[in-house]
Regions:
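Hydrophobic (often cysteine-bearing) scaffold residues that line and stabilize catalytic clefts
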Residues: 12, 16, 67, 71, ...
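Short, surface-exposed loop or secondary-structure junction motifs
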Residues: 96, 102-342
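Short, conserved catalytic-motif segment at the N-terminal edge
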Residues: 7-67, 87-89, 103-110, 115
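A short, polar/charged loop-to-alpha-helix boundary motif
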Residues: 51-60, 377-388
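Short glycine-rich, acidic/polar surface loops and turns
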Residues: 319, 331, 351-360
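Active-site SXXK
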Residues: 14-21, 40, 66-94, 103, ...
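Short loop/turn microsegments at loop-to-beta-strand junctions
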Residues: 30-32, 43, 196, 354-357
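Short, well-ordered beta-strand elements
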Residues: 358-359, 365-374
Length: 395
């Protein structure tokens, strides 16, 4: 740990800063923020570029970001708190808490008009919801669900109680596919806590972690610090109209798998807590044993595989293992062999569709956060910039 902190002296910080600045000066990104922290302190933070389309407002480390699927980490932590408290257990069927999912169906095929639905043998468990082995998928990366969603043949998460009518793509536990399991888990948290997700998160996670800028809804002050969502257009950028931040956000429903706004600094407090075995400034968020479960293989022989895009303008094909053998832990991607860009064996990571990425390396004793606000997800130039950022830290 001490060796890494000494490693992050001014010459090293300059190299990391240069990697971020290069992404802007080369035209690869319109804005970027990067942060590195130990369990006790922020070692490096830097922002570059502009957070608005007209290039008037500079990007800052406290700029408000739509963190999208990075919300899943918060939901996972909340669920593990409930496991610790004995309110739920990891291998309970989700129907124990949401009886409307007792007769869940599998979407076997879709011919453009009719859904072919078959019954499941088992109901997904809490653990399977957390590890993307439940059968719940995103239409973004599943052809049958994309076509059915496009034809409005199935409900989606945004409909009132829509989650009750969403089928799954395969028998729970039989495959791995990135999906909406954490959104379903969010419904479980609301049901057993009798609180909204924001109320639960605020009381049990945000307040003790001093995450004052993290919420589902933007305040007027937060909106003034928010970042315009951009879309790559050849060698330039345009505002991506469907995903713009607003004070009256479309995420009023509060989903467990997406929708939070945060900052690099706020989110780093979560990562620091994970580095410190569940503690942050005297507050114990999770037990040591729960933290260890998060950093362990929870999918057995099921490895992370490619997710093939159905909407290239929003997401590219992606694989979050970054070329190394990876599984899913409880809440994050687990890298038993590390990664080719320097992360240690047993490290963990995650991402959000607007190109937010983070990792936690317990062996070295640091965590990292990198974000722009851009679609499509896993954009080639974003990944190149992210890998240069990470490599400059580990080199």
């Amino acid at each position: 740990m001490e060796s890494f902190i000494s490693f992050m002296q001014e010459i090293k910080k300059n190299n990391v800063r240069d990697a971020l600045d290069k992404a802007i000066s080369s035209g690869s990104l319109h804005c970027v923020v990067g942060l590195v922290a130990s369990k006790d302190e922020i070692l490096f933070e830097h922002a570059a570029g502009f957070r608005d389309e007209k290039k008037i407002s500079p990007m800052n480390v406290d700029s408000i970001l739509a963190i999208a699927s990075s919300t899943k980490l918060i939901t996972s932590i909340a669920a593990l708190q409930l496991v610790e408290a004995g309110i739920i257990t990891l291998d309970d069927p989700v129907s124990k808490y949401l009886p409307g999912l007792q007769d869940l169906k599998i979407l076997d095929s879709f011919d453009g008009q009719e859904l072919c639905l078959v019954p499941t043998k088992e109901t997904p468990t809490i653990r399977q919801l957390m590890t993307h082995t439940s059968g719940y998928v995103y239409p973004f990366w599943n052809k049958n669900f994309f076509e059915a969603d496009k034809n409005k043949t199935i409900k989606n998460l945004y409909a009132q109680d829509g989650y009750l009518e969403i089928p799954i793509a395969f028998e729970p536990g039989s495959r791995w596919a990135y999906g909406i399991g954490l959104d379903i888990l969010g419904e479980v948290i609301k049901e057993v806590s009798q609180m909204s997700l924001y109320e639960y998160f605020s009381e049990n996670i945000f307040q003790p972690l001093e995450m004052h800028d993290t919420a589902y809804q933007l305040s007027e002050e937060g909106f003034k610090r928010s970042v315009t969502m951009m879309q790559r257009l050849d060698n330039s950028f345009i505002a991506s109209k469907p995903f713009q931040p607003s004070i009256n956000s479309s995420y009023a429903k509060e989903l467990g798998g997406e929708g939070l706004y945060s900052t690099a600094v706020d989110f780093s407090h979560v990562l620091q807590m994970l580095l410190n075995q569940g503690s942050y400034k005297g507050h114990k968020i999770l037990s040591d044993s729960m933290i260890d479960l998060m950093f362990s293989n929870q999918t057995g022989s099921l490895e992370i595989v490619d997710s093939i895009s159905q909407i290239p303008s929003i997401t590219k094909d992606f694989n979050l293992s970054f070329g190394s053998k990876s599984h899913w832990g409880l809440g994050m991607i687990y890298h038993p062999e590390g990664t080719q860009y320097g992360r240690s064996k047993g490290s963990a990571s995650g991402a959000g569709i607007f190109n937010t990425y983070y990792w936690v390396d317990r062996e070295v004793g640091h965590c990292g956060f990198f974000s722009t606000q851009l679609v499509p997800f896993f954009d080639d130039k974003v990944i190149e910039a992210y890998q240069e950022f990470e490599s400059s830290i580990y080199s």
